[in-house]
């Protein structure tokens, strides 16, 4: 878990010549891989798509121009044009200034809204787990993601987007939403879930 040199993996990718590379390595390893992949020149030949944990705004600020050309698949970005997201991002900026906001904060915000909706859906002094779970599954929240609900296996059903790295007015790179790639997409195994929602 402390690998810093990815020369062997990059050589394997170069030899294999795949149509694309999907990378998921959050934190320092992901930063090292991304920088070395860009330095190798492979990004010009073989596109890279990453998980949002591998390239959020914090990481973009660290790697800078090394992120140019990388694509991200994500269910949230700070430029989403919906009222709840605009309110959330404005509140974040008011409290934290220019500290980068990531999908972790957005998920935490939505999770708190879901918990509140679940609690509002039960009554009495004691909370029954079944009743609470049922209230969660039927909860309607004003999500920062836009359309959002929980599927039968309690995993999100949500839209997914392609993000790219753009240059801001200040000359610094940032993540920009390019297009929606999936609508109301849930866990493909949800139908096989044996969990009793009732």
Where are each of the predicted segments found?
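Extracellular/periplasmic periplasmic-binding protein-like sensory domains
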Residues: 36-109, 120-123, 169, 175-197
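Solvent-exposed, acidic/polar segments of extracytosolic/periplasmic ligand-binding ectodomains
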Residues: 137-198
């Amino acid at each position: 878990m402390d690998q810093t040199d990815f020369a062997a993996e990059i050589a394997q990718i170069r030899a294999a010549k795949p149509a694309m590379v999907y990378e998921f390595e959050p934190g320092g390893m992901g930063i090292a891989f991304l920088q070395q992949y860009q330095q190798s020149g492979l990004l010009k030949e073989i596109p890279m798509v990453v998980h949002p944990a591998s390239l959020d705004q914090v990481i973009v600020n660290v790697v800078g121009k090394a992120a140019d050309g990388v694509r991200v698949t994500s269910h949230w970005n700070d430029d989403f044009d919906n009222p709840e997201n605009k309110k959330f991002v404005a509140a974040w900026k008011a409290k934290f200034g220019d500290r980068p906001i990531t999908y972790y904060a957005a998920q935490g915000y939505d999770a708190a809204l879901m918990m509140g909706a679940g609690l509002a859906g039960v009554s009495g002094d004691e909370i029954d787990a079944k009743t609470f779970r049922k209230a969660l599954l039927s909860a309607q929240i004003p999500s920062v993601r836009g359309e959002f609900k929980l599927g039968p296996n309690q995993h999100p059903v949500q839209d997914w987007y392609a993000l790219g790295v753009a240059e801001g007015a200040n000359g610094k790179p940032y993540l920009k939403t390019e297009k929606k790639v999936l609508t109301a997409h849930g866990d493909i195994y949800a139908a096989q879930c044996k969990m009793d929602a009732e």
